[in-house]
Swiss-Prot record:
Family annotation (SUPFAM superfamilies): Protein kinase-like (PK-like)
Top-level enzyme category: transferase
Keyword Membrane: yes
Organism for this UniProt entry: Dictyostelium discoideum (Social amoeba)
GO molecular function annotations of the record: ATP binding; protein serine kinase activity; protein serine/threonine kinase activity
Gene that this polypeptide is encoded by: 7tmk2
Protein name per the record: Seven transmembrane domain-containing serine/threonine-protein kinase 2
TM helices/strands, residue ranges: 6-26, 43-63, 77-97, 122-142, 186-206, 225-245, 266-286
Protein family (similarity comment): Belongs to the protein kinase superfamily. Ser/Thr protein kinase family.
Active-site residues, Swiss-Prot/TrEMBL: 506 (proton acceptor)
Length: 704
């Protein structure tokens, strides 16, 4: 081989060696730092890419040493591997970056998983078809020509003889001519067309993935990953064109490079560098960024970070749209983690900026509450972070929680307008409501200002019934089994709070977060502990159980006057808190939660949000905390129960009695959270044992 014929093979050999080396290093980082599983798709991707680079290096080196006869089959086999691992990356992008609807409806999550499964099966069968088809065509070409080639890179065919007088000539003596399909043997035309179709399908698949994942990519990685993916699409498109348009002679291939023209040099190096080497490097970058790992032990594994808590630092978090505002004035946003073991995870973050001492105390209290609670029916706490100035002043506090976009008040609003005249409804309409409604409109039933405006601030004016204001829409009421099951979940969460001596103090439907399966509620979780109070402070309990003489005297002084004189701050705080943390105070605080739970029962029965009102009928007079006192002059008539309940009072009697007992005018007659939980547990058990109603959401969905 002349010395100048070594130039392009040597360049390509170096490029493929670098690609393979980078793939090996990346796979080791994925395994030992990112904690990817050995049998994960990530490692399968790197294995295919390393295999391709190895095959390219071997065949190029072999061709540089000696003339390889029939080696074109081996030189083109890595082209098939390129399509295989490029398809795997597209599949992973869909798998890891689902549509936002997955977070809105669990059914959408199932759809995404279904798409991934379908995509996996399509990719498997496509690979089987591609490899089988190519091997078959290579075999036919080997039999006809004796030197099987494809993709417009044909070996030396001068030794081939033909017995047909009208056979298409396989050799051209012209250099730099643009060869079209008519200048080749039909088997080569078929090979080129087959591979072109494979590349075209790969291009379409990646274009679809780019369209579906653009927004999530932008949220998580900025514009970086989208630009990388766009360059990849351009490279695949260029390679597809180069398969069809070939300025080289049929004697040219990666093993037999025609050196008569610089045009052929440029074409050959462009085909492999732009069409395979650069895309391979881009795919490595995309794969490395995708954080889809199988191992569950993320705690303290590090990743790019030194510790698990570093995940929540402000520079590692991308904050997105505003979700709402907490009771303390903190802003709640949707956010994603940009790097670390939880990279790509979506969470809700409560942000308190320009913190005063009261703000810091409020949010730190909420963090302490979350840290003590572990229940599937309480919004889970993920972590927290602080931005501290050089002087030690705290400028910002962030509290990270699991992301649940729906609240019970919005779901009740949806059901209140998705029914029919018979009190039933359409699950399809309800599902479409959640999928296609961009923003929820405020319910007139969620604010007392609605009634204030209509009552003209006149206590003697006619009382307004909420249901009378909605016309031309019908409610989609819950079934008995659903109401019992949802209330049972909330009661478990509430009892978990009270068992830990924590009073929520702001229990209402817009602080109950719900996940959905199809169009039905699957799980109810209590959240938003902005103004909750914990009564198990060790210092306070010690003061109450075993006060010193000085502490006892200060307790007596506190009850005798509105203020207390203290000598030191360390003594004052537990005394003041202890003075307001008597068994009677704790019982009263818990009874507030039970009263609020009773209004949530009413919300389920009427599809209204009475628990969100500032005024809660006459029972509001029993709130001891000023936070809950009825400060408005608006009167709201205690609502009548809907007709569907009156038609079957025997069935609904246990739930109605629970509602009445929880909203009793005498707080001492209200049940405890444990009593509520046991009552609903028995109702739930009766439903299952009787089999009169299908209580399982999954069964309900499958029967529709």
């Amino acid at each position: 081989m002349p010395s100048k014929e070594f130039i392009i093979p040597l360049i390509l050999l170096c490029f493929y060696s670098v690609n393979g080396f980078v793939a090996v290093i990346s796979s080791l980082v994925e395994l030992f730092i990112h904690k990817a599983s050995w049998n994960s798709i990530k490692i399968f991707f790197y294995s295919l890419l390393i295999l391709q680079c190895l095959c390219r290096c071997i065949i190029i080196g072999w061709g540089m040493i000696e003339t390889v006869q029939g080696g074109e089959f081996y030189s083109n086999f890595p082209s098939l591997l390129f399509i295989s691992y490029a398809g795997l990356v597209a599949l992973q992008m869909i798998q890891f970056l689902p549509n936002d609807n997955q977070y809105l409806l669990l059914s959408e999550g199932k759809k995404n998983n279904h798409k991934v499964k379908v995509g996996t099966n399509i990719l498997i069968f496509f690979n089987l078809f591609m490899y089988f088809g190519m091997f078959l065509l290579f075999g036919i070409a080997e039999k006809q020509v004796g030197n099987s080639t494809s993709f417009n890179h044909h070996g030396n065919h001068n030794s081939t003889t033909s017995t047909s007088t009208d056979e298409i000539p396989l050799v051209s003596t012209e250099v730099g001519e643009l060869y079209l399909f008519g200048d080749k043997d039909p088997i080569y035309i078929v090979l080129d067309c087959f591979y072109f179709v494979c590349l075209l399908l790969l291009l379409i698949f990646h274009s679809y993935v780019g369209w579906k994942t653009y927004k999530r990519n932008k949220d998580l990685f900025g514009i970086k990953l989208n630009v990388i993916h766009l360059i990849l699409l351009i490279c695949i498109f260029i390679r597809s064109l180069l398969v069809i348009i070939d300025p080289s002679s049929p004697n040219n291939s990666i093993l037999h490079i025609d050196t008569e023209s610089w045009l052929i040099y440029i074409y050959t190096i462009s085909y492999y560098v732009v069409g395979e080497i650069i895309p391979g490097m881009l795919l490595i970058v995309i794969e490395f960024l995708l954080p889809y790992h199988k191992r569950k032990d993320f705690i303290n594994i590090g990743g790019e970070l030194s510790s698990y808590q570093d995940v929540w630092k402000s520079e590692n978090i991308a904050i997105h749209e505003l979700l709402g505002m907490g009771g303390s004035g903190a802003m709640v946003h949707k956010c994603t983690v940009k790097k670390g073991p939880l990279r790509g995870g979506t969470f809700a973050v409560k942000v308190m900026k320009d913190c005063t001492n009261e703000d810091i105390e409020s949010l730190e209290n909420e963090i302490r509450v979350y840290e003590k609670l572990k229940s599937p029916y309480i919004v889970s706490y993920q972590g927290s972070s602080k931005v501290v100035g050089s002087s030690g002043q705290i400028f910002e506090i962030r509290l990270f929680m699991e992301y649940i976009p729906h609240t019970l008040d919005k779901y009740l609003l949806a059901r209140s307008v998705c029914g029919d005249s018979n009190g039933g409804g359409s699950s399809r309409n309800l599902k479409n409501y959640f999928l296609h409604m961009q923003e929820y409109q405020s319910s007139p039933q969620s604010s007392i200002s609605y009634y204030q405006n209509n009552n003209n601030n006149n206590n003697n004016s006619p009382l307004i019934q909420p249901q009378q204001q909605q016309q031309y829409v019908y409610p989609y009421y819950f079934r008995y089994s659903q109401v019992v099951w949802y209330l049972y979940q909330i009661s478990i969460g509430l009892d978990n709070l009270h068992a830990n001596k924590i009073a929520h103090r702001d229990l209402k439907s817009n602080n109950i977060f719900v996940t959905l399966s199809e169009s039905e509620v699957k799980i109810c979780k209590i959240g938003d502990f902005d103004i909750s109070r914990s009564f198990n402070n060790p210092k306070v309990l010690n003061v109450l159980s075993n006060p010193t003489a000085l502490q006892q005297q200060k307790l007596n002084n506190f009850f005798q006057s509105a203020t207390t004189t203290t000598t030191t701050e360390q003594t004052t705080e537990p005394i003041e808190v202890a003075a307001t943390t008597t068994p009677q105070t704790i019982h009263s605080a818990f009874q507030h939660d039970i009263l609020s739970f009773g209004f949530i029962v009413l919300d389920f029965l009427t599809l209204s949000n009475y628990s969100c009102f500032d005024s809660k009928f006459d029972t509001s007079n029993y709130y001891d905390d000023d936070k809950f006192n009825n400060k408005s002059n608006t009167k709201i008539k205690k609502p009548d129960l809907p007709d569907y309940i009156k038609k079957d009072e025997k069935l609904w009697e246990p739930v109605i009695q629970l509602y009445k007992s929880c909203t009793s005018d005498d707080p001492n007659k209200r049940p405890s959270s444990l009593g509520v939980k046991f009552h609903l547990a028995n109702l739930y058990k009766d439903i299952i044992e009787s089999g009169t109603e299908v209580w399982s959401i999954e069964k309900d969905s499958s029967s529709k």
